[in-house]
Amino acid sequence: MAAAAPAVDGVPGRGPPGEVIHLNVGGKRFSTSRQTLTWIPDSFFSSLLSGRISTLKDETGAIFIDRDPTVFAPILNFLRTKELDPRGVHGSSLLHEAQFYGLTPLVRRLQLLEELDRSSCGNVLFTGYLPPPVFPVKRRNRHSLVGPQQAGGRPAPVRRSNTMPPNLGNAGLLGRMLDEKSPPSPSGLPEEPGMVRLVCGHHNWIAVAYTQFLVCYRLKEASGWQLVFSSPRLDWPIERLALTARVLGGALGEHDKMVAVATGSEILLWALQPEGGGSEIGVFHLGVPVEALFFVGNQLIATSHTGRIGVWNAVTKHWQVQEVQPITSYDAAGSFLLLGCNNGSIYYVDVQKFPLRMKDNDLLVSELYRDPAEDGVTALSVYLTPKTSDSGNWIEIAYGTSSGGVRVIVQHPETVGSGPQLFQTFTVHRSPVTKIMLSEKHLISVCADSNHVRTWSVTRFRGMISTQPGSTPLASFKILALESADGHGGCSAGNDIGPYGERDDQQVFIQKVVPSASQLFVRLSSTGQRVCSVRSVDGSPTTAFTVLECEGSRRLGSRPRRYLLTGQANGSLAMWDLTTAMDGLGQAPAGGLTEEELMEQLEQCDLAPLASSRGSLPSPSPRTSLTSLHSAFSNTSLSSRRGSPSPPQAEARRRGGGSFVERCQELVRSGPEPRRPPTPAPRPSSGLGAPLVPPKTKLNETSF
């Protein structure tokens, strides 16, 4: 073997193609030839061996490269054979290393492999995309208004549109937002003005809150989702969002559909018009930071952990504030509102009735139950059984405590005077219970230990919870969801894991593992089984999500649909069909090529033209080279000989005459045409003459 060219300042000089190069990659030794490492131009290895990159050698003289040797092994195998064998290495890790080494053919092949499951049009569950709306003008009047009394009686200006707003890109929403920086949030964390902070839905309506304004969409059967309301720009970031889109009976007129937002201790309420537009109802003050904002029927409820609750009645147009014990949880069912407090008490409010005492104008708030251990009630769930008689519903309440306990209490309509009775107790959590859900078939609890979930199967008799055989343990799993420390992952209220869904149907958790993730995992709340996973179609991080139970079409045979709504960091909104995902649960996925099958197909072609380095390519297998898309000689042979009869010499060599190289040359010249039968040719002479001499055309090494 020829000696290598002398090195200059410790850098390997140019040597013969057959020179053996010793590498130390992350402590593991590899040996290969210079030709193998340098056949791709402008790569890390060609720069390294040409002296353009300084080298560091170990004690044995091998060139040291501080990279992962496990990932380097399939990369070196690709350089040797042009065939990719991942050898158990994850595709993203392999792509990252291929990009580091500058191996363009391998990078393109791996990028194509990644496109198997990625599409700008989403997958079969993707059902809609709403671009960012136009940034509204600033609200002119910021004086606090109570009830229907507005300044001058004029409603706030709103955007009226029945068509989809254009996506203006940098000239629209984001560009105008960057010109006018949004103020910092009350927590002092930086804000991303263009990202979706909160999403909520009710029936066929969606409300989307950005940093300083909100928009509402309505689903129409013929035209799809239409923008019907855009609020003025507010002074402070929106922290809470609530929407009610239908009140049974429709007796409230324009207040049948309302949307509300909270910023700090201030609450803004608008009435929505079905055909577009809206008017400001008023601005209300709770006096303390609003930590929960929701509708119970036509009543707007705002609560704070300090123990203050505010109620706005759509009929009386009255805003009332009441002090109770510090509130740690709440839930509503029908017209009942339950408040869990840190002293172990559960308070009850019937918001459907006139909620005021005539003598002192206080809310009718009464204590329903007190925890036996007086632990704080940190989670609440109310389940109303179907009416089995004229006496009313059987009320079942599950609650979690600050000590990790889970209790179920029940109250029969005939025993209202005696209060609820303790039914079951579970002590399976060692951290405070943060979420609890009692549904028709399951009891689900989540604690503060990385969202640890425990589930039980609930036995019922005639719709009522039964002790025979009683609740039985079902599953234990975790819904890991990390929160952002700098506020860039979205509003915490917009990333609630759930569970979502009706209490008489399968419910799901939505899992976003890291704050900047663009992929969400949908899992059954009862067992933790994965239903599906969705990835943002534009690659932007998901900053808010929710699940919407949408009314079915009026067409015969239609049924309600369940959608996953995802708000993105760039301001767009995507919709995913969870009904289809639930219907396909448990079915084996049927699709096209697997990753292995695709890689096998890609081995037959070059995805990157490398005409300048054809003469220095290593020798791949005959199958790979003969089907190469970039073999210039093969292409010209096909075009020049298409339709021409095969010469007798070619037929003779196909029958076994000549050397291996000669047969390969003849195959390339004739071109592979598997669909065309070979043209008959006379059998060559069987005499012992001199071997037939092939034409003078030369082939490069890739051709065989």
UniProtKB/Swiss-Prot annotation:
SUPFAM superfamilies: POZ domain, WD40 repeat-like
Modified residues (Phosphothreonine): 163
GO biological process: positive regulation of epidermal growth factor receptor signaling pathway; protein homooligomerization
Family annotation (Pfam families): BTB_2 (PF02214)
Positions of modified residues (N-acetylalanine): 2
Subunit architecture: Monomer. Interacts with CUL3; interaction is direct and forms a 5:5 heterodecamer. Interacts (via PXXXPR motifs) with SH3KBP1 (via SH3 domains). Directly interacts with cathepsin B/CTSB.
Protein name as it appears in the record: SH3KBP1-binding protein 1
